[in-house]
Amino acid sequence: WEIAKAFDYSAPVGKFKKISELKCVDDIAFGMKLNGEWVQQGHSRDMIFSFDRIIAHVSRFVTLNEGDIVFTGTPQGVGEVHVGDKLELFLEEKSVYVFQVN
C-alpha cells in the first residue's frame, strides 16, 4: 500500500483547525467531492479506534509534537483520480480545501 499512497505530492494538507473550534471531536463530519460529485462521506464516530486511543498507541513508538499529523485511514469511496480532476474536501459541511490534479 505504501507505493500507492506515499508518493510525491500525495498528501496535501490544508490549514489546521483548533480542536476548540469543533463541536465534538468524536463526531466530526468529513467528505470529498470529485468533480462536483460526492465520493466520500464519513464521521469520526465511525472510526474503529478513537483519536485518543490512536495517539496513545502511536506515541508509544514515536515522539509526537504539536503540528504532527497522524493519518488514520479513509471512508469508503476510494478511487482513482486523473489529471484535470477537481477535488474538494469538507469538514463539518464546510469546504476547506479545493485543488485540481495536475
Question: Which ranges hold each PLM region?
Answer:
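Catalytic-core "active-site belt" of small-molecule-metabolizing enzymes
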Residues: W1-F61, N65-I69, G77-N102
